[in-house]
């Protein structure tokens, strides 16, 4: 293990083997020490460690490993406040004396996840910097550390909306997990399956969502981890809605609701009611949709700093679809109260598009659909919205007797729908 430490700290300090070995031992002898192939003398080890500024003494690795894994489990179980407290009171003080490379890499990887999922101030770029620090040691990582690295980097790309990159990393992590030599637990495998289902959901790959969501549920249910099972049920609800299986969608969402209402989980309640409203809206049951949306908003507003603009937007949209323009305008104004106009994202396009529809401003609506909205969602491979907005534009062109343009966008909508498989 001391050889591993010497190699790790030599690389972090930017030293070549020749530079470290100079005046202490031969380069070939140092190479053998780093690989663990040589029976090294204490004197040589002490001199090498002294030059690197590290101690040759081992710490209680099992104790540190257990502590780091306990911290990680708090994050996986979404006990974010406890995870933060544990980091400051336990992890950081003890890590000051740790020099074992694998423990440091584990700590830095887990820290990257902590930055990413922080419940108050997530630091996405801080997380990415942590991951980049560990990247140069990927080839030397143990299989379980490689698994974590791939998982966490995929989470980063999912948040950045680069779903193809995220999926490639998750499939690589799945290959590692399937070798059964990683030391990764079954419950961590379930989290991997959930992230695969989540990423396929972003890409509207309905069949793959079901495949991985059910895999994850089978493990979560065995371990009585009903919170994570509920997350998977929500994904199944979303997928079934996309393909028009509304009864199945409602079934899965209400399965998740059993958990969230029992444990008074307002965050999950907000997500579920939001999606139940969307199911009702797709069926054109406006009063039912609005009832669910208001329940979602009530639940979301019980949590400080929670995201509400997507539900507010859907309330405005539902009033518009119900031909209640007065309330549509009232709720559209509320959308603009929480919308950051400098951030061009999904919500920006959904809300601006709705604004032009409510105002009957077809000139600006055609402009933003053709040049902004549709290309934006195509780039993200978000085919559901590509289909929705392409059909909307096709209908406008049809009403204007621009049949060639109308046909082009109907074809574009159909092509997008074929990607929802």
Model-derived regions, located:
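C-terminal non-catalytic interaction modules
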Residues: 7, 348-421
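A short, Lys/Arg-rich alpha-helix, primarily the initiator
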Residues: 1-12
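Helix-turn-helix repeat elements of alpha-solenoid scaffolds
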Residues: 44, 75-90, 117-133, 162-175, ...
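Tandem amphipathic alpha-helical repeat scaffolds
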Residues: 67-78, 108-120, 147-161, 188-203, ...
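Amphipathic alpha-helical segments of tetratricopeptide repeats
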Residues: 88-96, 128-139, 171-182, 214-225, ...
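Alpha-solenoid helical repeat architecture
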Residues: 99-105, 140-148, 182-191, 223-231, ...
């Amino acid at each position: 293990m001391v050889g591993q430490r010497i190699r790790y700290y030599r690389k972090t300090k930017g030293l070549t083997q020749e530079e470290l070995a100079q005046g202490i031992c031969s380069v070939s002898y140092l190479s053998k020490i780093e690989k663990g192939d040589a029976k090294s003398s204490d004197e040589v080890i002490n001199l090498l460690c002294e030059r690197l500024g590290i101690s040759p003494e081992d710490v209680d690795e099992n104790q540190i490993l257990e502590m780091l894994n306990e911290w990680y489990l708090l994050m996986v179980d979404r006990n974010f406040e406890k995870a933060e407290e544990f980091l400051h009171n336990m992890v950081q003080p003890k890590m000051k004396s740790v020099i074992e490379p694998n423990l440091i890499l584990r700590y830095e990887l887990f820290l990257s996840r902590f930055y990413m999922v922080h419940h108050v101030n997530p630091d996405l770029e801080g997380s990415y910097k942590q991951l980049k620090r560990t990247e140069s040691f990927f080839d030397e990582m143990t299989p379980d550390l490689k698994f974590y690295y791939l998982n966490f980097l995929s989470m980063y790309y999912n948040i950045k909306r680069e779903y193809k990159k995220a999926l490639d990393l998750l499939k690589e992590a799945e290959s590692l997990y399937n070798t059964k030599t990683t030391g990764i637990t079954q419950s961590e495998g379930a989290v991997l399956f959930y992230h695969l289902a989540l990423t396929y959901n972003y890409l509207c790959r309905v069949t793959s969502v079901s495949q991985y969501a059910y895999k994850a549920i089978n493990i979560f249910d065995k371990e009585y981890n009903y919170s994570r099972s509920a997350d998977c049920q929500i994904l199944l609800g979303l997928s079934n809605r996309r393909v028009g299986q509304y009864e199945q969608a409602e079934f899965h969402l209400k399965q998740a609701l059993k958990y969230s209402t029992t444990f008074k989980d307002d965050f999950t309640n907000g997500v579920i009611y939001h999606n139940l409203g969307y199911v009702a809206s797709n069926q054109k049951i406006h009063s039912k949709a609005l009832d669910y949306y208001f329940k979602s908003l009530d639940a979301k507003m019980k949590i400080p700093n929670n995201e509400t603009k997507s539900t507010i937007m859907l309330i405005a949209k539902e009033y518009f679809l119900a031909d209640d323009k007065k309330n549509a305008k009232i709720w559209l104004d509320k959308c603009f109260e929480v919308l950051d106009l400098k951030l061009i994202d999904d919500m920006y396009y959904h809300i601006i598009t709705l604004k032009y529809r409510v105002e009957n401003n077809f000139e600006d609506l055609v402009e933003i659909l053709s040049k902004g909205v549709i290309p934006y969602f195509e780039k993200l491979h978000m085919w559901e919205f590509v289909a929705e907005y392409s059909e909307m534009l096709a209908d406008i062109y049809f009403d204007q007797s621009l049949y060639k343009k109308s046909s082009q966008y109907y074809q574009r909508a159909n092509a997008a729908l074929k990607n929802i498989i």
